[in-house]
């Protein structure tokens, strides 16, 4: 019974419900049997009526079968007949209710078969994913992803972070966020190290699409390679006396280190200034000649066999330590590739490795904490003499201005330029018919079109892009089989000499190339080139006039461009060395030319100051109005590739201000293409107005002096003519 009770508990249907089902089935069977059984005799009926009849027949099927026999199939004649009937019939009792009982053997065997034939977990997972992404579920709307946002919104989110580290972390979110983060990071570019400028130029040359993201370029905050803050105050003293200057023991890398990064001598990390010991030099010349052999390098950072052997023999020659060091050297040289890679990775990183920190403790006047925080590499020992400079080659700046086509703001203040050359590769071609001695002509090959060479390396466009010396491009010649007869012995075939043909030609870069690169920018709104020596007054004039002409042609307002040339030029207080809107700079240019570059005759003619004898009273111009009609005599030439154009000044009107403030306006007549300038001379409000008022006051003073001289020269004639008529 314990087993039966357990089985009853395990069933999904209660015992009472089963009993009701079975009793209902029994009643139906009794009715069917009662109809089929024959009629009993009288004796049998009497016995049954008394209630003392005992039925001895073993066939109890007519009275029904117990639930226990039905479920567990006891061997009896009635049970066997019922089982046979159930097997024969399609919906027998046992077949219908056996699946509800978990304790039966059939249930266990069926479960084992299902478990054996069931798919594995991976197959179930795949089937679940297939059902999940089936067509029936495709009509369901998925949740929106962060990558589904428009690019403008993502860029606005990244721009509002206001943290450079957080903006750089957005590069790792996804591909969409990486592209938007690049636009924000490259939008405003500022540099404090010339080494980073060289890296940036190389990056833009390899990936020109990044240059389109740059809108602002600031090179005014470049610093020298000195590590100590105290040395920055001595920069002027160092630049003045270069012969008595002793380079520091350690300095940060500059653009020269980036240029020669692949050079075996200048790019070697073994010769970095961080590995130098504090040995005292006698002079700069002796240190430069014998620096490779006199200074001790860092032993842990060295990977050269010869350097280690030479050092070990010098320091401990004849001792047992030499053998140990050589053994250690060869054991390190035959180390596995994985270990070598990790060792090189530690040494070649932009920051300092743990091995470098040992040399920081004896670096001259440096703090180990400050060096550890620095991400800049250290300069080569041969470049220590350039540590006090913060210059940039002219080719780097032209690269930046050429690749960053969407620049709106340029700041080149406080910038020193290093001379540079443009590399032109010459090609020779034959003109006319083919002969033994054809004529040869040279043609230039623009390397800017072919950025990469056959080895997938950047083709140097300027001399600062290459790590080769100057004489390589000066002396390299083509290998040619063309020979040319000597002019002195034309008939002697043995006197033929080979004509040398240069492969490269170096063209020096000037300020004109820089101005052309600046003027090629179509979206420039702010130009700051203040406190520089290399910007001449003619360069200022060219930038002002060309910018004005481009604005007039494109129908743009002159108030949208701001220029600053304050403190620039070789001379102090240059007239054009000012700052202000383009409209103010154009006005400053015109007034300066009229004051300094025009003769007295031109001024007299423009302002109509010449005396003309008449028989009427001469009406002199009022003191408050000065009108100059320059017409074709005052014009500005703008050189272009097709033909030069002229910007002419038609009228210059100077009056006293009615409001008391200094105002000016420049307009251009579309019909005669003349500039009309109107000036209201009053109290200046800005620095630009102060300089404009000074120039206009000088012009008015000159005009008034010329008018007085004209009146003094013709005083008698005017008095005679007017008195006679009176």
Curated annotation (Swiss-Prot):
- Keyword Chloroplast assigned to the entry: answer is no
SUPFAM superfamilies the record matches: F-box domain (SSF81383)
**Segments of this protein annotated with the region Disordered:** 276-295
Q: What's its job? A: F-box protein probably involved in ubiquitin conjugation pathway.
Protein known as = F-box protein COS111
> Keywords assigned by UniProt?
Ubl conjugation pathway
Low complexity biased stretches: 284-295
> Which InterPro entries is this protein grouped with?
F-box-like_dom_sf (IPR036047)
Q: Write down the species.
A: Kluyveromyces lactis (strain ATCC 8585 / CBS 2359 / DSM 70799 / NBRC 1267 / NRRL Y-1140 / WM37) (Yeast)
User: Which intervals hold domain F-box?
Assistant: 143-194
The top of its lineage is: Eukaryota, Fungi, Dikarya, Ascomycota, Saccharomycotina
**Keyword Transcription regulation recorded:** no
Name of the coding gene: COS111
């Amino acid at each position: 019974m314990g087993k039966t009770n357990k089985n009853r508990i395990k069933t999904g249907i209660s015992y009472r419900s089963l009993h009701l089902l079975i009793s209902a089935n029994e009643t139906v069977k009794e009715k069917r049997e009662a109809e089929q059984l024959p009629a009993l005799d009288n004796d049998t009926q009497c016995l049954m009526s008394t209630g003392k009849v005992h039925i001895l027949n073993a066939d109890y099927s007519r009275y029904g079968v117990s639930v226990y026999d039905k479920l567990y199939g006891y061997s009896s004649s009635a049970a066997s007949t019922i089982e046979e009937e159930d097997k024969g019939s399609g919906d027998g009792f046992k077949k219908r209710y056996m699946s509800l009982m978990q304790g039966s053997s059939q249930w266990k065997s069926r479960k084992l078969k299902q478990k054996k034939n069931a798919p594995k977990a991976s197959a179930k997972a795949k089937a679940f994913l297939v059902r999940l992404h089936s067509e029936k579920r495709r009509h369901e709307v998925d949740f929106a992803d962060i990558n589904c946002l428009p690019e403008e919104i993502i860029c606005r989110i990244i721009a509002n972070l206001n943290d450079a580290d957080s903006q750089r972390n957005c590069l790792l979110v996804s591909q969409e966020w990486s592209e938007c983060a690049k636009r924000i990071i490259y939008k405003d570019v500022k540099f404090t190290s010339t080494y980073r400028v060289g890296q940036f130029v190389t990056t833009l040359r390899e990936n020109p699409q990044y240059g389109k993201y740059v809108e602002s370029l600031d090179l005014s905050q470049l610093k020298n390679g000195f590590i100590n803050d105290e040395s920055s105050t001595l920069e002027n003293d160092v630049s003045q006396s270069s012969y008595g200057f002793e380079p520091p023991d350690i300095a940060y890398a500059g653009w020269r280190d980036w240029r020669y990064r692949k050079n075996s001598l200048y790019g070697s990390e073994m010769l970095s200034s961080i590995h130098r010991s504090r040995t005292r030099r006698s002079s700069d010349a002796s240190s430069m000649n014998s620096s490779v052999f006199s200074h001790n390098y860092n032993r842990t950072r060295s990977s050269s066999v010869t350097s280690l052997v030479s050092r070990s023999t010098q320091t401990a020659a004849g001792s047992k330590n030499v053998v140990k060091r050589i053994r250690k050297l060869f054991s390190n040289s035959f180390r596995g590739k994985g270990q070598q890679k990790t060792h090189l990775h530690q040494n070649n990183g932009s920051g300092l490795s743990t091995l470098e920190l040992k040399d920081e403790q004896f670096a001259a006047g440096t703090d180990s904490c400050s060096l550890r925080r620095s991400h800049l590499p250290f300069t080569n020992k041969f470049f220590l003499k350039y540590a006090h400079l913060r210059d940039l080659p002219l080719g780097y700046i032209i690269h930046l201005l050429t690749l960053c086509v969407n620049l709106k703001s340029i700041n080149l203040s406080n910038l020193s330029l290093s001379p540079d050359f443009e590399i032109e590769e010459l090609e020779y071609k034959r003109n006319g018919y083919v002969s033994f001695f054809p004529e040869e002509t040279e043609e230039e090959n623009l390397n800017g079109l072919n950025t990469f060479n056959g080895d997938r390396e950047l083709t140097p466009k300027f001399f600062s892009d290459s790590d080769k010396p100057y004489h390589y491009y000066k002396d390299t010649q083509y290998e040619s089989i063309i020979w040319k007869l000597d002019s002195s012995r034309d008939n002697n075939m043995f006197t033929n000499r080979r004509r040398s043909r240069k492969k490269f030609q170096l063209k020096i870069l000037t300020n004109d190339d820089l101005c052309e690169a600046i003027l090629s920018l179509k979206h420039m709104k702010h130009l700051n080139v203040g406190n520089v020596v290399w910007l001449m007054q003619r360069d200022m004039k060219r930038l002002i006039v060309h910018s004005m002409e481009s604005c007039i042609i494109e129908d743009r307002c002159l108030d949208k461009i701001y220029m600053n040339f304050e403190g620039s030029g070789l001379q102090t207080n240059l007239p054009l060395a000012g700052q202000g809107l383009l409209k103010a700079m154009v006005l400053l240019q015109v007034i300066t030319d009229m004051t300094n570059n025009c003769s007295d005759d031109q001024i007299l003619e423009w302002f109509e100051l010449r005396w003309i004898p008449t028989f009427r009273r001469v009406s002199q111009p009022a003191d408050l109005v000065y009108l100059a009609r320059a017409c074709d005599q005052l014009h500005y030439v703008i050189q272009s590739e097709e033909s030069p154009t002229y910007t002419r000044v038609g009228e210059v009107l100077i009056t006293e201000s009615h409001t008391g403030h200094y105002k000016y306006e420049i307009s251009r007549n579309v019909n005669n293409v003349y500039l009309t300038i109107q000036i209201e001379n009053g109290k200046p409000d800005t620095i630009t107005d102060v300089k404009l008022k000074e120039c206009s006051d000088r012009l008015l003073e000159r005009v008034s002096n010329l008018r007085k001289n004209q009146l003094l020269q013709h005083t008698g004639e005017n008095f005679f003519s007017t008195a006679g008529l009176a």
